[in-house]
């Protein structure tokens, strides 16, 4: 069995083994989650050599970034997930209309606010 570490669904976080699974939701979609797993079960199912291939992390961290996402940061697994869409140039008349309705005369401030949320998700912003 020649599994690459990225293909192995198991992770070791600190001293715990976790399995990455797709959890089914009632709406028919799935979300990825981590569930605890037993190391002895892994040995029985795959052999002791398999355990050496499991990716190891010291713990979890949460570092949001939409432009420079990193799954691993200094030996820690980032719990923040990348967003599935990326901005593209072009016209957006319907979104512009909704934002104009929400922000009114201050729509330019709304554009700046949304841009900051995307580019600098760690920056503290006022509640609008």
Ranges and model annotations:
Residues 67-128:
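P-loop NTPase catalytic core of nucleic-acid-dependent motor ATPases
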């Amino acid at each position: 069995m020649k599994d690459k570490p990225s293909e192995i669904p198991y992770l070791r976080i600190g001293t715990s083994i976790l399995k990455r699974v797709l959890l089914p939701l009632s709406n028919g979609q799935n979300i990825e989650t981590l569930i605890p797993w037993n190391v002895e079960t892994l040995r029985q199912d795959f052999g002791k050599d398999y355990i050496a291939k499991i990716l190891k992390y010291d713990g979890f961290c949460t570092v949001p970034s939409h432009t420079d996402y990193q799954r691993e940061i200094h030996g820690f697994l980032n719990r923040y997930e990348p967003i599935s869409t990326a901005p593209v140039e072009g016209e957006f008349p319907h979104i512009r209309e909704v934002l104009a309705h929400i922000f009114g005369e201050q729509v330019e401030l709304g554009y700046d606010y949304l841009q900051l949320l995307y580019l600098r998700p760690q920056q503290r912003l006022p509640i609008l």
